[in-house]
């Protein structure tokens, strides 16, 4: 027979062990819940990032830019790679949340950079085209304007929209000082 005091002591030890195990289990369950929330949040952000990428590409397609600069394709490739890295990180088991968060941040930054470039390209190309069209009214009256517009059109068709815009506005400002403000205002409205 086992003495009662020993049984009581053993029961107390077992009770303490069970309490510690319950605490560890509760902590683990909370941690798993947090990991699931982080994974879910990352998947939501991936969806948002993909939407931004789609919007950036649609912006370029909608304007029908004649020539896209090489850096656009580099940034597009980097953005797609950033998304692929997020997907690869989400497919890993177990997921390392710190790595996943880094991939999501990097992917978002790359896609936003592409979106910004797309916006700038379409705005600059649109403004350059508008300036050339506006300047055409002076083409027959001013020989220098005709030559300048030929140069600006070549720059435009080669994809150097910023240079084309600068060339056209410089020529227009000689004939109509301050016209660039009116053109920008008209373009933005």
Q: What are the language-model segments listed below?
A:
Residues 1-189:
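Long, charged/polar, soluble alpha-helical segments
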